[in-house]
Amino acid sequence: MLNLSDRGFVVDRAVFIPSIAFLLSTVGIVLLCPNASGSAFGTLQAAIVENASWFYGIVMAILLVASVVLAFSRVGNIRLGPDNSSPDYSLFSWLSMLFAAGVGIGLMFYGVAEPVVHYLRPPVGEGAPVGGENQAVNLTMLHWGFNAWSVYALMALVLAYFSFRRGLPLTLRSAFYPILGDRIYGPWGAAIDVFAIVCTTFGISTSLGLGVEQLSTGLNYLFGVPESGALKLAITVAIMAMAAVSVALGLDSGIKRLSEINSFLAIALLCFVLLIGPTALILGGTLENFGYYVANLITTSTNLFTYEDTEWLGGWTIFYWGWWISWAPFVGIFIARISRGRTIREFLIGVMVAPTLFVVLWMNVFGGSAIDLIHAGEVSFGEAVANDLSLIH
């Protein structure tokens, strides 16, 4: 192990070297053979959708049920840390960091686009169906709501428990301690951490790509900056630099403050759109759509369109389930790190309910406003969004 503790870093070569070798090899192959790589990834995705959709559905259902059961069982009273410990962060700071960790760029990118696409291009059939508004927003909330956060919650809970109650490292390998025992400190543990790093990198790449596309399109629209590979590279470098500075400043001085600023800005933007838009319609739609979402949660979560000839599932639900699962090691470690001192019940309710309620508000305010524009005759706006999601800036 390479010890750079004087600079705040400890590098485990058994994890770092295989991870960087695999990732660089993958990037190299994609750069050298972009068409073949794209075709291979497309074939793999199609095979997963055709043969493993049921597995994704079962896993997501089990995680959701397990989260609810644990939250309201006797183990909910266990504290993640010493029995007399208190939370490291205030409720607002904690929730702000949850929001920033799990849904930041994604909400900005999909808040308008996804409900519009589901409305104009529903899973089955063509055009905007009667009652399609409920279905469009409901599907969006399904992808960003309780199911997604149950993945993060359980991963973070396991890591927090073994780290703060058993004194194990705050890494994915610790989740396998009940199975592997002390072997987590050997090759098996290193392999698990390599897997976590690879999954995290793919998840971050997806989010970063969405943000870069959105910023690039926004700069082109507002200031006439030509969209190009150089522009996207510059945006990517800028985002990575800001992230690096935030991490270098530490959790309290960097990530915490940045998360709080993000939360204030997001809430301000949400309130602004709510007040200048069709406020009564948005609030009524929010209540109606949330009721529809909760009432149909089991049905929509397990609907794989098995008997329908549609490619919608692979492009949306299965894509999201895979995205959340790939993000889980990274987001889980971060959520565990900021949740020391909270009870399991408080932790699970906070991680699952608070972000989901914010998602419900966000998707209904922005998605509802966009669908109302389409009703008002702005069909070209809807078609533009459906054809190019990055137009939403």
Task: Describe the residue ranges of each PLM region.
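Selective recognition of specific alpha-helical transmembrane segments in multi-pass small-molecule
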Residues: 21, 97-106, 196-205, 233-248, ...
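N-terminal alpha-helical transmembrane segments of multi-pass membrane transport
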Residues: 1-132, 271, 275
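Helix-loop-helix junctions that connect adjacent transmembrane segments
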Residues: 217, 223-235, 272-321
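Helix-loop-helix module between adjacent transmembrane segments
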Residues: 7-10, 14-17, 21-31, 64-67, ...
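Membrane-water interface regions at transmembrane-helix termini and the short interhelical loops
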Residues: 2-8, 34-48, 68-88, 136-143, ...
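Extracellular/periplasmic helix-exit of transmembrane alpha-helices
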Residues: 110-124, 273-297, 356-388
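Conserved small/polar residues in nucleotide/adenosyl-binding loops
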Residues: 392-393
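Membrane-water interface at loop-to-transmembrane-helix junctions
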Residues: 190-194, 309-322, 339-348, 353
